[in-house]
């Protein structure tokens, strides 16, 4: 009975003071890296596996602005562009998705997928506006992990990257993230 009374009173004091007790053992990132390093040295883990694990941890510290395709390298289509002009541009620069803008890149109208272009480009009354899809936007200072979560939950493979003023800074794709992990 005395031990029970002592335990109960100790728990009551802990609850009243707001202290939290934890019996869990928490493993840090550095401990995991050390275990992986030791496994690699012992031959239990391949170096390529160690490299991927380290890249996963490093990816958590990165922002999408550091892995995106910059706006200066971005191929985009003008909303009123002719079918012939689009065809030539796409032949030279094959991508899965193209931003579509009005007059300048910061005036995004939406995006168009390559497969939609193939399906409609030869139609006599082709208009880019007819096959537009809504664009997805991510702030450039968003973490890669957070972006990956959005890409996964929204079932999309890209996002246009904006600065704090809403200007387009580039595009990030699921492929960019995979390239950082495996590249």
What name fits each language-model region?
Residues 1-16:
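Hydrophobic alpha-helical segments of integral membrane proteins
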Residues 19-183:
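Soluble cytosolic regulatory domains appended to membrane proteins
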């Amino acid at each position: 009975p005395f031990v029970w009374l002592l335990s109960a009173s100790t728990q009551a004091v802990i609850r009243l003071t707001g202290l939290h007790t934890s019996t869990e053992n928490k493993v840090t990132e550095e401990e995991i890296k050390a275990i992986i390093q030791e496994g690699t040295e012992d031959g239990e883990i391949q170096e390529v596996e160690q490299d991927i694990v380290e890249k996963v941890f490093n990816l958590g510290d990165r922002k999408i602005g550091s892995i995106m395709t910059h706006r200066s390298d971005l191929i985009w289509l003008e909303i009123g562009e002719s079918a012939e002009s689009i065809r030539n541009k796409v032949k030279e620069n094959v991508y899965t998705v193209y931003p579509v803008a009005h007059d300048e890149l910061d005036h995004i109208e939406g995006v168009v997928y390559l497969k939609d272009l193939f399906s409609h480009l030869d139609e006599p009354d082709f208009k880019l506006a007819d096959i537009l899809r809504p664009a997805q936007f991510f702030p450039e200072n968003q973490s890669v992990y957070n972006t990956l979560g959005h890409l996964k939950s929204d079932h999309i493979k890209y996002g246009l990257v904006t600065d704090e003023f809403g200007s387009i800074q580039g595009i990030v794709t699921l492929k960019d993230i995979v390239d950082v992990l495996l590249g």
